[in-house]
UniProtKB/Swiss-Prot annotation:
BP-aspect Gene Ontology terms: coenzyme A biosynthetic process
Primary location: cytoplasm
The species this protein was found in: Ehrlichia ruminantium (strain Gardel)
Residues that, per the record, bind ATP: G11, S12, G13, K14, S15, L16
UniProt-recorded name of the protein: Dephospho-CoA kinase
Pathway(s) of this molecule: Cofactor biosynthesis; coenzyme A biosynthesis; CoA from (R)-pantothenate: step 5/5
Length: 201
C-alpha cells in the first residue's frame, strides 16, 4: 500500500485532485475536513471538548460552527491549545484509517489534510504531492466559498510558502487549466510511482 499526501495553499484544488485519484486510480481518500465536520456533528466527546474551551459555541449539544469560527479567527493561545487536542483525535482516526486499509487490497491511500506538512501529517506518507493553482484562481474559489479576506490571510500565514511546499514534495500537480490536464498529471504520477516501486496497476 502506498500513502500519498496532498499539500497546497488554500483553494489550490487539493480536494479536486483527491477526487481524481479516487475516480481514476481507485485510491481511497482520507478527507480530514469531512472527519472534523463529522466530529463536530456527531462525536459527543468532541462536542464536550468544544464546550470546555468555547462555551458559547455549543447550544443544546450542537456545535455552532459560525461562532466557533470567531475563535479560530482570533487564533490565540486558547485556540491553539484546543486545536492541538483536536489534531490528536484526527491523527488517531487517520492512523486507524490507514491501518484498516492496509488489511484490505488497497493500493493507494490519499491524505487530503489541511496543513499536511505544517502539522506533520506528512510523516506517514510515502510520497507528498504539491497541488498548485495561480493566486487569482485561488481567490476566486475562496470567494465562492464565502471566505472573508481576514480568514484567507490568516490561513495563508499559517501555511508554508509555495516554494517550501515544492521543496518538501515529490511531485507537483497544477490545477486550473482543464480537467483532462489534471487527470493526465495524476496518471503520470501514478506511472512514475509504480515505476519506482516496481509494480503495475
Amino acid at each position: 500500500m502506498i500513502i500519498l499526501g496532498l499539500t497546497g495553499g488554500i483553494g489550490s484544488g487539493k480536494s479536486l485532485v483527491a477526487s481524481y485519484f479516487n475516480r481514476f486510480v481507485k485510491a481511497v481518500v482520507f478527507d480530514a475536513d469531512n472527519v472534523v465536520n463529522n466530529l463536530y456533528n456527531f462525536d459527543n466527546n468532541v462536542i464536550e471538548l468544544v464546550k470546555s474551551y468555547f462555551p458559547t459555541s455549543v447550544n443544546n449539544g450542537v456545535v455552532d460552527k459560525n461562532d466557533l469560527k470567531h475563535y479560530f479567527l482570533l487564533y490565540d493561545d486558547l485556540w491553539i491549545k484546543f486545536q492541538s487536542e483536536l489534531h490528536s483525535i484526527v491523527w488517531k482516526i487517520q492512523k486507524d484509517f490507514i491501518l484498516s486499509n492496509s488489511r484490505r487490497i488497497t493500493k493507494y491511500v490519499v491524505l487530503d489534510v489541511p496543513l499536511l506538512i505544517e502539522a506533520n501529517y506528512h510523516n506517514c506518507c510515502d510520497f507528498v504531492i504539491h497541488v498548485k493553482a495561480n493566486s487569482i484562481l485561488q481567490r476566486q474559489r475562496l470567494l465562492k466559498r464565502g471566505m472573508s479576506r481576514h480568514e484567507f490571510e490568516l490561513i495563508s500565514r499559517l501555511q508554508l510558502s509555495d516554494n517550501d511546499r515544492k521543496r518538501l514534495s515529490d511531485f507537483t500537480i497544477r490545477t486550473g487549466l482543464s480537467k483532462n490536464f489534471v487527470v493526465s498529471q495524476v496518471k503520470d504520477i501514478v506511472f512514475q510511482i509504480d515505476s519506482r516501486v516496481g509494480c503495475k496497476i
